[in-house]
Swiss-Prot record:
All ranges on the Extracellular side of the membrane: 32-118, 195-205, 274-315
Pfam families: Fusion_gly_K
Organism, as annotated: Gallid herpesvirus 2 (strain Chicken/Md5/ATCC VR-987)
Protein's name according to its UniProt entry: Envelope glycoprotein K
Subunit structure: Interacts (via UL20 interaction region) with protein UL20 homolog (via N-terminus); this interaction probably plays a role in the coordinate transport of protein UL20 homolog and gK to the trans-Golgi network (TGN), and is required for the cell surface expression of gK.
The keyword Translocase is assigned to this record: no
Principal localisation: host cell
């Protein structure tokens, strides 16, 4: 069950990443071709009515003019509609052509504009990026709960011996200090025994357990809310089919969007409806056999040298992990901000960020 869930979550992360990249490429193509603008137009300006306009994609064979020489309404969200207004022609400059029989059907009076490149960026690309981040956070929180928190099924638990700091301390003590460091392993074993006891209580009566352990309840609820937020942001892509900007999307891209949404829904439903593991029947007073190697520890020699080496292994591993984590976060944040700014300038000519 746990392995299948982890594989499913990794599959969701992979699907969101691939679709987001495809959407960015498609939006870049729209921006370069100048086909990312749509207009709320009236064929006959004398029949002006806010309910009678129709949205249509920019067409270079048509003539677009502002109704009454007034700037049309934009689409909101600070959507750079000034880019779309550059295609508008002053009505007075074509007054002679407007009365011509062959030209009049090509004139469109514009009452509103919308830059769909900005809409797709602000609404969908950023929502998918947030969904990807929330799914990643959920995956990390879930793995930590499986290692240090309570779980309902034994198959969902992860041995605390796999804790990164425990492994780092063991490697440093073995490779650099030529000694055997078991203090962290013993501590992880004690945590695992305590965690297993809490998990049995949680499995027998989850509601009472969460009532008596409010911190665990808050953490589990937070984990669920993070996943729910990721699902909502991801499925918000469905709105792409019901907005005027749907006109700038090709049929093949709409098909890819439908396939992507279908994959996410199928994976989430499979995780929701998948049955849990069946516990074997046990006789009264019978206890399950514990794995012999679960808390097996090597005996380490004693002495001042070994004590100093163990302290060094613990300190060095702690500092090393924190330094690597800080460097990773700095590089990740700088890369994301710089890439987003560069991409916004390429798409819109300017960026939201200063």
């Amino acid at each position: 069950m746990s392995i299948r869930t982890s594989i499913a979550l990794i599959g969701i992360l992979f699907a969101i990443s691939i679709y987001t990249v495809l959407l960015v490429v498609y939006v870049s193509t729209l921006s370069q071709n100048g086909s990312g603008c749509i207009y709320a137009t009236l064929v006959d300006s004398s029949l002006y009515d806010a309910k009678n306009f129709t949205w249509e994609q920019y067409n270079s064979t048509l003539i677009y003019t502002a109704l009454g020489n007034k700037l049309p309404l934009d689409g909101g969200f600070d959507d750079f509609s000034d880019v779309c207004r550059t295609y508008l022609v002053n009505l007075t400059s074509i007054s002679g052509l407007a009365s011509h029989v062959s030209t009049k059907p090509k004139i469109r009076s514009v009452v509103g504009t919308r830059n769909c490149v900005t809409y797709l960026w602000r609404i969908h690309i950023q929502s998918l990026s947030s969904s990807l981040g929330l799914y990643t956070i959920f995956y990390v929180i879930r793995e930590w709960r499986r290692m240090f928190g309570v779980v309902r099924f034994e198959d969902d638990a992860i041995s605390t011996a796999r804790y990164t700091k425990n492994y780092a301390a063991r490697v440093i003590s073995s490779v650099l200090l030529n000694t055997t460091y078991t203090k962290m392993s013993r501590f992880m074993c004690e945590i695992m025994i305590y965690k297993n006891a809490l998990s049995r209580t949680f499995k027998d009566d989850p509601i009472s357990f969460l009532f008596h352990h409010p911190i665990a309840a808050v953490l589990i609820i937070t984990e669920g809310l993070v996943r729910l937020g990721a699902q909502c942001l991801c499925l918000a892509t469905l709105s792409m089919y019901f907005v005027p900007c749907e006109k700038v999307l090709s049929k093949w891209f709409l098909s890819i969007t439908g396939i992507f949404i279908g994959i996410i829904i199928c994976i989430e439903l499979s995780l929701l409806l998948a049955p849990g593991p069946v516990d074997g029947a046990a006789m009264l007073g019978e206890t399950k056999q514990v794995k012999k190697d679960e808390c097996a520890l090597e005996t380490s020699p004693s002495g001042v040298h070994v004590f100093c080496s163990n302290c060094c292994a613990s300190l060095i591993s702690n500092i090393l992990i924190k330094v690597l984590y800080i460097l990773f976060m700095i590089i990740l944040i700088v890369t994301i901000v710089r890439y987003e700014r560069t991409l916004q300038i390429a798409l819109f000519g300017r960026a939201y960020l200063p």
